[in-house]
Amino acid sequence: MKKLLVLVALAACGGTAKKPEAPTGRQAKAKRDPVKPAAYKEFEAAMRAVRLGGPEASETARARLRSALKIDNTIWEAWFDLGAIAWKEGDDDEAVDDFSKALDINKGHTPTLMARAEAYRREGKKKEARADYETAAKNMDEDDPNKRDVATRLASLLRDAGDYDDAVEVLRDTVRTSGINAKIYTELGQIYLAQKRYELAQLVLSKAVQMDAKDPAIYNALAILAARQGKPQESFQLFDQAVSLDANFIDARFNKASALLDAGDYARAKTELAAIVEKRPDDYAAVVSLGVAQRGLKAFDEAKKDWDRVVKEAPKKSAPRADALWNLATLKLDFTEDAAGGKADLERYLQEAPSSHARRQDAENKCKEVKCH
């Protein structure tokens, strides 16, 4: 497992909580009582486990953080880091609970609000996520560059929900008070993409390139635009350009692989996905897709091996693990004629996959069709 970082994927938020000193953020001015020495020692042990890394880092850190909180439950940083561990493991209910306890102590702390917003978002609780994004933005000074990043996250939430007018309004309000940047143009382009307003998408994405010609996310969006316009070669070239700008920008390579899978070009998709997995072995979504490519090439044993690995290694409540369980079931039922094994995997999926997982209804219908019980 990679060395634990607290929600590195979150906009305007990253890194583990600092040592328990004074609460951070311009809204947190109240004087704080000293942390009990025994609790501080446990907290430091948790941070040491994080720094050292290794497969047991998260479990060790979690145990130490809980021990610290038994001694002194006012250490908001410990609640924050517990939430981060839960979020990384896909346990969004626990993450929300832990972040909420951190906010009860360090009220209005922007990184914690952003972290909780991301957990709510992944749970599908749009209203709660939106409220936290909006509160985080209000807590920031107008000239804080992170305010524009928070706005793009909120706008993307609204875009995903189909609330395009609200998403555009959020960006316009932010531009009026805090100015424009390439990320705002890029998000606006993605909103227009979702609305199939391709000329406007092209216009604003071109402006994004003018502001930051080295941001791979812009070329990723342009590649998606080209694909929507029926220009596959241009799309692939733009995906490649995004990757050339930042070899660690996996989104472009993954999107290219997804386009290849959709086109039935399983061999090229496999090449792209294998490159992702080689660079990031714990990118379980990529491993699941690699299994799909293997299945398309009729390499059923290899596909099963990929999905078995995800089931074994991925966080128990994560979407990739649920995807792997579903794919194992359909592989056995629809491709290898292992009806008994497929039924067992379907039942396991229904027992272990999150209730909000995209394939749950399909699994329930499939289970009735094959008479699981």
Each language-model region and where it sits:
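Helix-start (N-cap) detector for alpha-helical repeat units in TPR-like alpha-solenoids
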Residues: 32, 39, 76-77, 110-111, ...
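Residue-level recognition of tetratricopeptide repeat
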Residues: 47, 84, 118, 156, ...
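Alpha-helical segment of the N-proximal tetratricopeptide repeat
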Residues: 37-71, 88, 149, 156, ...
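Canonical tetratricopeptide repeat
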Residues: 81, 115, 149-153, 187, ...
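Structural marker of alpha-solenoid helical repeat scaffolds
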Residues: 71, 105, 139-143, 177, ...
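Bacterial signal peptide processing site
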Residues: 14-17
